[in-house]
Amino acid sequence: MYKILKSTPNGIDELELEQLEKGCWIDIVSPSPEELHEIAAATKIQLDFLTAALDEEEKSRIETEDDQILILVDIPFLRSNKDYDTLPLGIIIAEDFIVTVCLEPNAVVADF
């Protein structure tokens, strides 16, 4: 699932993929392969960058390729048994978009 958000003078608008425009934030959570391919095609963001945070064992790092930057960090995540664990959060900075990718909904991104 994903949400596309755009800041406007009246607040924050949620857009459809067909309405994607420069300056949007795409927040991706537990996406299907089809959704990832749609977003990659619409944004020209590398599929490898979009899928990096979907591997629970992925290590934190910064990677650059062309005009895109991938920042991968581990964030705290509360498991159902009340134990904390970590999950990768991918932050992709592209020329026209910012994208966040995570396996689970999380408080880090929800605060925005």
What are these regions, as identified by a protein language model?
Residues M1-F112:
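Peripheral, non-transmembrane regulatory/ligand-interaction domains of membrane transport proteins
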